[in-house]
């Protein structure tokens, strides 16, 4: 098996490195170099490109004459189906989407692909080879016939990028609580991995832990008070996250409904307070801006400016 990857960004580099470790011959070509001018020597062509690049690149490849008839072409975009490569259908053995549900954050530090899932959907031969490729990377190929790729990609982004955003706030909260900032990510990484393990092994609702699950309104109230004093900008996110946990906690049933109701009241009160503070802050900024405009056009200011001329 020979693989040609067009696109040397985070995904392309990570896939190339992982494939080479498995002894697979890989050619990695940066997208900035454009479509090759000579015949591609590969049975699988992977387009590791941005969504907006796929249609024009597919069209260029289709008319370039460099795609072997025996090759299949796949793309790694999560929100786009195989049909975005439609111009290539007549010049190769098949097209497919091959999206790894993995977070690629760096050009140099690659994520572990093992046990990751890959959504594969397209023409039969392209699906077959994409599945083979995924298995060589020790990943699990999946195909959902009626998949809405936009919703699928939104779910992946919500979890991957939402978790990163939550962790960033967590770093700030640890820092204002006495943890050296450089140490905070090292502490949160294993925590996130344990959450991932729980989600995979237990599913929901059982993967939820913490004071909301236990119905501990007192603990949540103390945390809200601390956030309000030391990191008020994080309070709306903290409260919204807590409210999202409530229905999960209700499904688990560890805490009495009365305790969960108390938790809900504490969170809703905090959310209203955060909203009121935001409105006051916004109003203050508007008033300050209006004041500056009024002052800048006052007679004394105008007189001073004229006197300088």
Name each model-derived stretch:
Residues 33-109:
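Rossmann-like NAD(P)(H) cofactor-binding subdomain of soluble oxidoreductases
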Residues 186-309:
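NAD(P)-dependent Rossmann-like dehydrogenase/reductase catalytic/cofactor-binding core
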